[in-house]
Amino acid sequence: MKNMLLLSSSKYKNTGYLEHTLPWLQNFLADYRGKTIAFVPYAGVRRTFDEYEKTVQNALSYLEMNIVSVHHGKQHRDIIEQADVIAIGGGNTFCLLKQLYEHNLIDIIREKVNNSTPYFGWSAGANVVGASIMTTNDMPITYPPSFQALQLFPHQINPHFISGKMQGHNGESREERLAEFLLVNPTALVYALPEGSALHIQNEMATVLGENPILCFSENMECGTFDINTTFSY
């Protein structure tokens, strides 16, 4: 059974790093105490892999699990193959996907998650689960071999979604950017995850968690809303 927890962000309002995810992760990983999480740190542009690993280990110590970054493996995929759970951290989605391709991790992650290995990721780690990374918010832009992502979720994901424009901002709003994407890709669906929200995906069903409803945009910016604790098929 496919079992994934996709988190919009690592923080919500004034909470600490991954603090708001605590109850979700405790429930999500209730049967995995003492097991190993393979952590993928590639999105962390402004910190070393060791620093990112330590940050996540400290934040998730309450899970009582062994968190090991893939960069410790002679081949990074070795850590993925041996792990009980897979996690991908947030940061820059372009850098993340580029290195997933470079280290030959796309297929092994896809295979393991499709065969019941739990997966969780935040921000870029949620974005990369979708069909492609073409609805990321990120800079700098690096060029992976393809913008096609893990495709464990068949639609587009836009984390950190904020509706409307901030005062004094004269650029495009998030809705306007997504509308442009849907003009170019009219058959796509974009699931927008506001801050503090998450999707728990089990096979072909998804449940909304968190503080804010999740939005689904389609051609002509038709918008569906999925309220907190709603379960829907995708």
UniProtKB/Swiss-Prot annotation:
What are the boundaries of the signal sequence?
none
Q: According to its UniProt record, which residues of this chain constitute the active site?
A: 123, 138, 160
Substrates-to-products reaction catalysed = Dipeptidase E catalyzes the hydrolysis of dipeptides Asp-|-Xaa. It does not act on peptides with N-terminal Glu, Asn or Gln, nor does it cleave isoaspartyl peptides
**Documented EC number(s):** 3.4.13.21
Q: Which domain of life is it from?
A: Bacteria
Pfam (any one): Peptidase_S51
Q: What is known about what this protein does?
A: Hydrolyzes dipeptides containing N-terminal aspartate residues. May play a role in allowing the cell to use peptide aspartate to spare carbon otherwise required for the synthesis of the aspartate family of amino acids.
- The name this protein carries in UniProt is Peptidase E
